Amino acid sequence: MINELGIDLQVNQGQCSWAQLTEIAHIAENNNYQTLWVADHLSGQVMNAPSMPECFTLLGALAAITSTINIGPLVANVGNRHPGVLASAAATVQNISGGRLKLGLGAGASPTSTFAAEQLALGIALPATMSERHAKLEHTLDVLDEIWSPTRDEKFATFEMPCKLPPRIIGVNSMALAKVAGARTDGVNIRSSHPQRAEILRVAQDTATAAGKSDFIVSVWDWFDEALLDPTSAGCKELASEGVNKIILLMRGVPDAKRLAIKR
């Protein structure tokens, strides 16, 4: 597993203007944040925002104005797009960015969740059970593998192919999906405050180790806290003891440029 503790930044793009996002992207790039993440939502309502710029469209724009920082969705909801459309969108961003995409993927919310309101408003049917949502995510992984394969079927010959395969990281809340992450992808992500964080991350890491992966990404997301910018802090040491090698910090509202501009 990767041992270095990396620090990433996530923004809620629905609460930012394009000018603000441009400024934040440059600050993050110039202050050693490894990846700039955006959300994948269709409605601003579920993120307390007045609107919500589309995820991959925004990532393409961010790719064009940056040169070194990685970019990605945390996480792309597999219920929002046909997997073939997701493959095309992700490959396009990967190529615009010159290979800087990190592809976060998620199974999506229950149809009874408040987060499902945006899909229901558009008439997008959501799988009723967790196992069905997990199966949909695995089907998406299958389609990505098929379309991006160097030996892909001739029918995909002129579909966008990424310049290199983007690392895939699954956002999880359960042991079951942690096993999928460890077995089939390049990383796992979980909310730092999840009550079973350590156990779920251990399952993902053990599964990845059994699959022969030595560079598995073990990440958590948390609200922005300057203390977590210091790898010697108690919080960072606790996470590192659980195998975490990446912290993704989400700032509420419009990111504060002064708080972000901390050389590390």
For the regions a language model picked out, list residue spans one by one.
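Active-site-adjacent structural elements that line small-molecule/cofactor binding pockets in enzymes
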Residues: 1-264
